Amino acid sequence: RDYYASRGLGDVYKRQTLVNAILAICKNSLSGIGGEIRPGIVHRLDKDTSGIIIVAKNDIAHINISNQIKERKVKKTYIALVRGNVPEEEATINMPIGRSTRDRKKMAVNKDGKPAITHFKVLKRYGKYTLLEVKIETGRTHQIRVHMAEIGYPIVGDAVYSNGKNEFGVEGQMLHAYKLEFEHPTTKKHMELIAPLPQYFKEILEKLY
């Protein structure tokens, strides 16, 4: 294999960084493109977003998958719990995202920003909350979080874009990178990798029934 698919490492290494967890598991069998800071890491997940991430074992695989991401050939699917009852069964958000003019540490919908496209579909409604399947065409920083907050349905637990509300006391936003689809860099086979929801996410959904 030319890559590792890390599923929920945060559950095992709660008090360590993703890099430490990867090094503990993979040792020296990693792509060197990212250097010591990001060994083998091909793409990113927002801080406190759970789920799957691809780590390349060699430079060829790293470059191949990076190119697939740039060409929008990698399909990313997320599961998100948002605040509010989303009326549409499915919809597309097409709003450019750039650095916030009010707070440079945050991102925001900005007419001068880069194109950002997010698709979502309702999986289940829980009164004041809605569970969504979210797919992104672009990979802007904080894209899903910014888009959902912009249309009035912020992600539960998002300390940055949800006005500080955290009604379930979760550590981070309830946004989970559920599935990745891409072409294997060597065999060219279609790959579909899934990371099940974390236990805390499942428990909160059970409470909402």
Q: Regions from the language model: what does each represent?
A:
Residues R1-Y13:
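Single conserved hydrophobic/aromatic residue that forms the stacking wall/gate
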Residues E71, K75, I79, R83, ...:
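Flexible glycine-rich active-site/ligand-binding loops centered on an Asp-His dyad
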